[in-house]
């Protein structure tokens, strides 16, 4: 990930477990991995991010975005280390005219937003040392993202149908990584 690359560039050692190394659906696996890792901070980027599919996979979305976050937060508390939690603009309902700030009232309108807000609440309630970063439309040059998703069908059909009532701020992972580190 770009976060790992940025940390390494700045001289930090990192752990970046894949799904087989860190099963976010297993509290025991999370506890064992983190408590035995000797880490000095946690940057929690992992998430269930398929917003539409989350409506059909509610339990899995909540398990990954909320419950796993609670377990990670508990480990950070035990180790007395800071944590950065990557959240989303989906914690808001999108009805405000203008930009949202961290002081605006949250009001998620879907399971994804609800699950990320639940994760935020665990971070705030359990930890003293934390940052919550709400970002949107995250993209990089390699992965699936909104821009690639839109370009693919438009190239194939020379036509594209999308919603016209959504406003967002695309976030490049390299830029975000520099700010996080």
Predicted regions and their residues:
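NAD(P)-dependent short-chain dehydrogenase/reductase
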Residues: 121-181
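SDR active-site strand-loop-helix element
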Residues: 17, 42-46, 83-88, 93, ...
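Catalytic helix-loop patch of NAD(P)-dependent Rossmann-fold dehydrogenases
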Residues: 63, 67-71, 91-133, 137-139
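Conserved catalytic-core motifs of eukaryotic protein kinase domains, centered on the activation segment
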Residues: 52-59, 94-98, 143-144
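Adenosine-cofactor binding site in Rossmann-like domains, unifying the SAM/SAH pocket
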Residues: 8-32
